[in-house]
């Protein structure tokens, strides 16, 4: 501590301006040099430091403002996305409900169509059976009639002889002749 006070006392006892002396006491000169350098730095560096701090403050302020703007935009986009999501979910629910009702309606239509087709097939089957029965009945009638005619023809052929045949033909010719005379 004595050295520091000695160095300040030395300042008062410096030689006049005409002479220049080097102070070789390093411990005494360093605090003086440091105080001078710090004084010069504070005096001249105050403006630079102030400008640097102002610039840094402005950059930080702009960064904060940009961050707030980005945050607001992100919030808006999030709200829009949530609104779109709600809309899509609503549409999906509507499509799901409509889809289920459409499936039920199609199912009922298909069941109705199947029942209608089954009824038509049943009607076609019954018509085919009726038609086949009529055809079989007609065939049976034709055969019975054919057999009856063959039996009657056979009976007539066995009962008719030539004389009876000639008499029948003559009687029929006579009937035709009388009918002809009446018409004239």
Swiss-Prot record:
Question: Molecular function (GO) terms listed?
Answer: proton-transporting ATP synthase activity, rotational mechanism
The regions listed as transmembrane in this protein's record are 27-49
Out of the domains of life, which is the source? Answer: Eukaryota
Q: Where in the cell is it found?
A: Plastid, Chloroplast thylakoid membrane
Q: Which UniProt keywords apply?
A: ATP synthesis, CF(0), Chloroplast, Hydrogen ion transport, Ion transport, Membrane, Plastid, Thylakoid, Transmembrane, Transmembrane helix, Transport
Q: Which family does it belong to?
A: Belongs to the ATPase B chain family.
Additional information: In plastids the F-type ATPase is also known as CF(1)CF(0).
Q: By what name is this protein known?
A: ATP synthase subunit b, chloroplastic
Organism from which the protein derives: Phaseolus vulgaris
